[in-house]
Amino acid sequence: MELKDYYAIMGVKPTDDLKTIKTAYRRLARKYHPDVSKEPDAEARFKEVAEAWEVLSDEQRRAEYDQMWQHRNDPQFSRQFQHGDGQSFNAEDFDDIFSSIFGQHARQSRQRPAARGHDIEIEVAVFLEETLTEHKRTISYNLPVYNAFGMIEQEIPKTLNVKIPAGVGNGQRIRLKGQGTPGENGGPNGDLWLVIHIAPHPLFDIVGQDLEIVVPVSPWEAALGAKVTVPTLKESILLTIPPGSQAGQRLRVKGKGLVSKKQTGDLYAVLKIVMPPKPDENTAALWQQLADAQSSFDPRKDWGKA
């Protein structure tokens, strides 16, 4: 299995700090998100970037990855044992030696009982939009084959067509019975576990079953009220901005959050007041008229008060 260069994927250096990596991640997430990008490999690139961020954003996982990367070209000595003369031997050699010393009966007596196969976990990236309905997904993974010493001798590529149910959440585990490694001596197969990773979205943040989206509004829209078009996971809606709205105010849109078997969350629009560019002479005069009309208003009146 090839070890990916996550730093190259993110376009950063191994010495870069988390802030630099986070900036690169946000830029690439916006660039390759399927809702925005027109590049044919956008979805694959987006998932690759999300995978890299998942590792590099965690201090412990990043340290472990750096150590693995440093030793990626080291010989895999753990797959073989060495005789005194330096020649390697495998499990069959070990059995032959055991039989020659203790006899065939002893060899048969050391046969292990039936044992269940190993479970396998793989991470599956899912877009927020995909959580709304059940969808099919083709997944590929490597099925390890163990030798008599419990060590991996080879990996067999395997592909499955699976159903991802509606309402899956981040970190949720889906069990595919019997799709793990084969059991030993007639034992049952292990299972395959799909661990759901909800890919970060350029517009929405997840808060439990709810979603949050930052909605930019002009000062006059906040002051006078307005109707603005806001995207949701399914379609765009017309959101009413009440007169006198404040920056950071949260407006609830019922039933437009995440869907699960038990409930449907809401969408919260968080208002962000955006000032226009530096005013020209006429615009500045209008702002001054507003300031004169509201001369008694002090936005810092309660500043610092409990």
Curated annotation (Swiss-Prot):
Transmembrane stretches, start-end: none
Keywords: Chaperone, Cytoplasm, DNA-binding
Pfam families per record: DnaJ, DnaJ_C
Limits of the J domain: 5-69
GO cellular component: cytoplasm; nucleoid
Keyword field contains Amino-acid biosynthesis: no
GO biological process: chaperone cofactor-dependent protein refolding; protein refolding
UniProt xrefs under SUPFAM superfamilies: Chaperone J-domain (SSF46565), HSP40/DnaJ peptide-binding domain (SSF49493)
Localization annotation: Cytoplasm, Nucleoid
GO molecular function: bent DNA binding; unfolded protein binding
Broad class of the protein's primary localization: cytoplasm
Function statement: DNA-binding protein that preferentially recognizes a curved DNA sequence. It is probably a functional analog of DnaJ; displays overlapping activities with DnaJ, but functions under different conditions, probably acting as a molecular chaperone in an adaptive response to environmental stresses other than heat shock. Lacks autonomous chaperone activity; binds native substrates and targets them for recognition by DnaK. Its activity is inhibited by the binding of CbpM.
NCBIfam families assigned: PRK10266.1
Protein name: Curved DNA-binding protein
Organism expressing this protein natively: Escherichia coli O157:H7
GN (gene name): cbpA
